[in-house]
């Protein structure tokens, strides 16, 4: 390992590659805003987030909390008692109750691991109850809260000094939560040249700052906030914002280059979003430029209206588009009238058919609201299986709440990744505990590919609360076989991780004999008696190669096998916000003002409106390219929510 001045390390097998591929842009990092340097509206907003800073404030910290005996909301106070963080409840009914909490906010972990920017990396605490740095849903100030277990569910509660008490459900299955929380393959050290140095606190200094700990596995770039729909669940709509945000081609190229300049792991996957990205006047030119700049995966977050046109889809494919992240809330128009206010199913079907014609992949993206369309989870899975030749995955997105909502309604409509695991298990025959895993579970797979190739490969060291799901093998008779049923994944990934670290330490690429050992590990942990009868080990290996190598292809011939990803990506909002999650975010936004984690840009502190206004244009009040049957529909009446697409 080569150690930099801040104790973060670059694996030796990547040193040569990094020397041969210096960044193109030479951006100088900006300083974190202070009382003396604050000038803009955004600057003062950043400062306001720090005004109750728990680390600066210290203990004791007064709040309200749910009594562990009677469940009433009572006065409480976090105190330091004999080097232990303790929440002291003052319950009128049950008296004074003390409850110790796991903590690394006031009791820093002694590990000496730092980011490339020199900031200490605090380990994830899987134990409960624990302290958490979170946000006030009303004002976005960073405040102290706690994760705790009640009636088999995991909850977060907090009290803002200005706006009072809030509580939200994190996961309705504590066993599912605990399994995810304990899975870890070590920490990543972030990016080598962060755009903000000497950050004071997360998330007040986003852009990315030197506290950030993860690379980007997928970067979003908003081409426009204009749209040919007016969905009530969208956070990026010019008709609501009152202005147009639409970067120029030159600005977009610079934003793309900033992603390619990520080190030590360049960003290779970009998603153009909006608004509706397909209505940008330079859409095809932008997609083509991304291909020429070396992005190996180019996708769009789209409602499918433009892509339903065959000629438009053909031009998009020829420009270099690989995948559609297709807004897909259900399998009939009754659902779309609820969530989008428009009958859209025919556009979804036409879009998928065009992707089938031109060989593009589709990932279905449903926004799931408990009690509204969670009955569609199984139906969407069935639809994906019926279209497995084109649909490669489903990214279920539990809704994020950006508007005000009382706790009763929040609980009624909050859909968690634990809910999703159980709904998918019922629909597929999978086990909600054994067969589902967090996104960071795949880190060893990326590590071993990197040492084989001798070059950086994207990794997913995100927080286990951010996303979880499973891959399925899909047999010709459309039966689903979860990967963990066919593979003993836990011991196999553990061995792959140890082998990758050994090769990194030795500073060399994998030899022929190393590759044989890797193949043996896959063979050793393969369970053919649990697999589809026609899934041979050779087809299995070729299928895994096809998931990371376009030359092999995904289920494209008799040598490979169809696979389907079914996962939940639970973006945060101010009610369930956890600063530890943000520091490990792997879904980023590239903007003219720098790069932001998804949940700080959209649905936590929400930097989006500040950035967009800085580059806004005069609003053309009428959305463009709206088909007549859609344009005349009335918008749905739902609460203010957010979704990606």
What would you call each of these model-derived segments?
Residues 54-62, 79-84, 123-131, 148-153, ...:
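Short, flexible, mixed-charge glycine/proline-rich loop motifs
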Residues 541-644:
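C-terminal target-recognition/interaction regions appended to catalytic cores
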Residues 67-70, 91, 136-139, 160, ...:
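Short cysteine-rich clusters marking metal-coordination/redox-active sites
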Residues 6, 12-33, 357-559, 642:
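Radical SAM enzyme [4Fe-4S]-AdoMet core and its adjacent flexible, acidic
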Residues 90-98, 102, 148, 152-177, ...:
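Conserved alpha-helical substructure of the radical SAM core
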Residues 43-55, 69-77, 116-123, 139-145, ...:
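Short Cys/His-rich Zn2+-coordinating modules
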Residues 6-58, 104-127, 177-202, 206:
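Short, intrinsically disordered terminal segments enriched in charged and Pro/Gly residues
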Residues 252-271, 280-398:
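Radical SAM/AdoMet-radical enzyme domain recognition
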């Amino acid at each position: 390992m080569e150690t930099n001045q801040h104790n973060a390390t670059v694996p030796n097998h990547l040193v040569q590659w990094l020397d041969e591929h210096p960044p193109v842009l030479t951006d100088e990092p900006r300083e974190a805003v202070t009382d003396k340097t604050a000038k803009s509206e955004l600057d003062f907003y950043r400062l306001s987030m720090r005004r109750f800073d728990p680390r600066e404030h210290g203990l004791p910290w007064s709040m309200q909390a749910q009594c562990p005996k009677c469940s009433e909301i009572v006065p409480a106070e976090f105190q330091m008692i004999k080097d232990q963080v303790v929440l002291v409840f003052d319950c009128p009914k049950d008296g004074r109750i003390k409850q110790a909490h796991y903590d690394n906010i006031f009791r820093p972990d002694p590990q000496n691991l730092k980011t490339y920017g020199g900031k200490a990396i605090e380990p994830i605490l899987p134990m409960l109850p624990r302290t958490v740095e979170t946000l006030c849903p009303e004002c976005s100030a960073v405040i102290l809260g706690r994760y705790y277990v009640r009636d088999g569910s995991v909850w977060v509660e907090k009290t803002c000094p200005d706006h009072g008490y809030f509580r939200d459900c994190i996961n309705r299955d504590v066993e599912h939560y605990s399994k995810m929380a304990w899975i870890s393959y070590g920490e990543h050290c972030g990016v080598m040249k962060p755009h903000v140095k000497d950050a004071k606190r997360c998330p007040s200094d986003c852009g990315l700052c030197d506290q950030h700990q993860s690379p980007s596995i997928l970067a979003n770039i908003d081409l426009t906030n204009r749209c040919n729909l007016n969905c009530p669940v969208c956070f990026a709509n010019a008709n609501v914002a009152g202005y147009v945000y639409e970067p120029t081609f030159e600005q977009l190229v610079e934003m793309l280059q900033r992603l390619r300049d990520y080190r030590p792991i360049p960003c290779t996957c970009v998603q153009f979003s909006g608004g509706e990205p397909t209505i940008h006047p330079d859409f095809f030119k932008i997609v083509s430029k991304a291909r020429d700049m070396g992005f190996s995966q180019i996708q769009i977050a789209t409602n499918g209206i433009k892509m339903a046109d065959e000629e438009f889809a053909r031009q998009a494919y020829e420009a270099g588009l690989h995948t559609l992240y297709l807004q897909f809330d259900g399998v009939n128009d009754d659902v779309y009238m609820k969530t989008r206010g428009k009958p859209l199913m025919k556009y979804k079907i036409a879009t998928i058919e065009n992707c089938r014609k031109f060989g593009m992949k589709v990932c279905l993206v449903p926004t799931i609201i408990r009690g509204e369309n969670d009955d569609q989870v199984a139906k969407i899975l069935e639809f994906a299986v019926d279209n497995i030749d084109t649909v490669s995955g489903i990214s279920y997105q539990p809704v994020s709440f950006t508007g005000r909502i009382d706790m009763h309604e929040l609980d009624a409509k909050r859909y968690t990744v634990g809910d999703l695991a159980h709904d998918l298990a019922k629909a597929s025959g999978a086990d909600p505990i054994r067969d589902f895993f967090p996104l960071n579970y795949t880190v060893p797979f990326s590590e071993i590919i990197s040492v084989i190739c001798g070059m950086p490969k994207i990794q997913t060291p995100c927080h286990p609360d951010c996303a979880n799901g499973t891959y399925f093998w899909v047999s010709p008779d459309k039966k689903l076989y979860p990967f963990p049923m066919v593979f003993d994944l836990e011991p196999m990934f553990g061995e792959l991780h140890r082998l990758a670290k050994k090769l990194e330490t030795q500073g060399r690429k994998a030899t022929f004999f190393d590759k044989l050992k890797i193949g043996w590990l896959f063979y050793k942990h393969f369970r053919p008696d649990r697999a589809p009868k026609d899934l041979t080990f050779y087809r299995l290996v070729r299928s895994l190669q096809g998931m990371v190598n376009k030359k092999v292809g995904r289920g494209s011939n008799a040598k490979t096998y169809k696979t389907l990803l079914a996962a939940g990506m639970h973006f945060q909002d101010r009610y369930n916000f956890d600063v530890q999650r943000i520091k490990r975010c792997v879904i980023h936004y590239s903007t003219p003002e720098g790069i932001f984690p998804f949940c700080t840009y959209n649905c936590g502190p929400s930097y989006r409106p500040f950035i967009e206004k800085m580059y806004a244009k005069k609003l053309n009040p009428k959305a463009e390219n709206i088909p007549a049957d859609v344009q005349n529909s009335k918008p749905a009446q739902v609460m203010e929510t957010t979704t990606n697409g």
